[in-house]
């Protein structure tokens, strides 16, 4: 599977954990873990919430190569 998002990297850059994000979003840690490993992807509304929580633009959450392919 292609790496679609950079969520794991952005969390590290922001010094945040997947546990922190799961608590803020009200989802399980396993869900956030799947997003971080690109085994599944959050929906667009959740991506918008994530970008707001992390203070980054939504485009920063996507892998550049993926964005170039769409």
Sequence positions of predicted segments:
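Recognition helix of helix-turn-helix/homeodomain-like DNA-binding domains
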Residues: 27-42
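DNA major-groove recognition helix of helix-turn-helix/homeodomain DNA-binding modules
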Residues: 45-60
